[in-house]
UniProtKB/Swiss-Prot annotation:
One of its GO terms (molecular function) is peptidyl-prolyl cis-trans isomerase activity. Belongs to the FKBP-type PPIase family. Tig subfamily. Its main location: cytoplasm. GO terms for biological process: 'de novo' cotranslational protein folding; cell division; chaperone-mediated protein folding; protein transport; protein unfolding. Its EC number is 5.2.1.8. It comes from Clostridioides difficile (strain 630). This is Trigger factor. The gene is tig. It is found in: Cytoplasm. It holds the Pfam family Trigger_C.
Amino acid sequence: MKAELIKKEGNKVTLKITVDNNKFEAAVNKAYNKSRNKYNIPGFRKGKAPRIVIETQYGKGIFYNDAIEILFPEVYPEAIKELDIDPIDNPDLDIEEISKDNGLVMVLNVEVKPEFELGNYKGIEIAKVENTVSDENVDAKLQEMVEKNARLVSVEDKALEDGDTAIIDFEGFENGVAFDGGKGENYNLVIGSNTFIPGFEEQLVGKKAGEEVEVNVTFPEEYHSQDLAGKPVVFNVKINDVKVKELSALDDEFAKDTSEFDSLDELKADVRAKLEEEAKNRADAETRNSVVEKVAENTEIEIPEVMIQHQIDNMLNELNYQLQYQGFGLQQLLEMTGRTMEELREERKEDAKKLVKSSLVLEAITKAEGIEATEEEFKAELEKMASAYNMEVEKIEASLRDADKEDIKGQIKIRKTIDLLVDNATIA
C-alpha cells in the first residue's frame, strides 16, 4: 500500500492510496467467495460457477465494489497514520484506476482537524469557587430526610390545600366525548405539584373526600397531543380520600430509624461530612471547567461545521438517552414544546462549538506537553471499571477493543492535562 498527500487547503486534504494488483486481486477473490452463492449461472450449481464465468456474464468489475469494501477498512487507517492526518468525517472516495499495472488507485477528499496556534495556557487567573457548608445547609438536608420519610395518613373531613394528597378517580371529556388517556382510578395527586393541566389542581382546593367535582380546563397550545392542544375539556373527578404528610420528630429516634447512627448528633455530623465532600467535588469541577474555558478563550480556532454538527448529534443522543429513562423521547419533547428538530439543534450550536473548541485545545496542549497515560494509570482505570461493574479486571480488559483502550488512555491524558492547567493557574 502506498499513500500520498496530493493537496491540502485549510482543513481539507486530498490523498491518494494505491493498492498493488496482487493485494487487490486477493480482495476480489474474497469478494467472489463471499457472494458467489447469489448468482445463478446455467450449467453450474448455485455457488459453483467459477469467478471468470460470472465476470464474463455480468462484467469484469462485478466484484470490485465488494473488494474495495473489504480493503478499505485496512488500508485507510494505515494511510492516515502514515500521512499523520486526523480526519473529522468520512471521506469522499473516487476510484481513479484499476489495472494490472497499477492495481487499485483511490483518491480521497476528507476534512481534518484544523491547525491553530495555541494561546497562553499557563498562569491563567480564575476566581476561587467557595465550597463551604453552613448550618442552614445541614438543617435543610435533614429536613429533606424528614420529608422523604414522612407517612401519608388519611384525615376525615379535611378540606384539600396545597401539599395535601388527593386520591382521585377522573375521566376527561371533549365536547361530551371521552378522550384517550383521560381516565384514571385511585390516582395520588399532590395538590400544588402542577402535575396535571394548569388549573386542574386549583379547582380541587377546599374539597373533601367523597365529593364529586366538575373540573373545567383548557389544554395548553403546546400540548403533545395535537388532537387536544388548545382544546377546552371537562373532567369528572371523584375525591376518594384526602391524605396529609405525618412528619417524624427530628430526634435520636429518627436517626436510629433512618440511618446506622444512634443519635441525631452523629447523623448531623455524617450529613455535614457528605455535604462537604459534595461541595468540594462541585468546586473542583467548577474550577477545572473555568480553567479550560479560559484557556480555550485564549486560542483562535476556525471550527469546521462538521465537527459542530457531530457534537450536536452526541448531545442530542445523550438527551434522548436521558429522556427514555423518563418514559419518552426526543420526538415527544419536540411535540410538547412545539419546536422542530432544526430549532433544537440550533439552540445547542453555541454550546457544541465551545465543547469542540475546548476539546481541540486540550488535545493540542496534551501533545505540546508530551503527556501520556502510563500502564499503571491504565490499570487503575480498569480497576475502577471492574469495581463499578462488579467484574474481574481481567474480564474487563478482555472485553475491550483496541479502540476502547485508546479511548480510556485518551481520557486519562486529558485529565492529566487539566490537572496541569489547574496546577499552573492562579486561583484567587
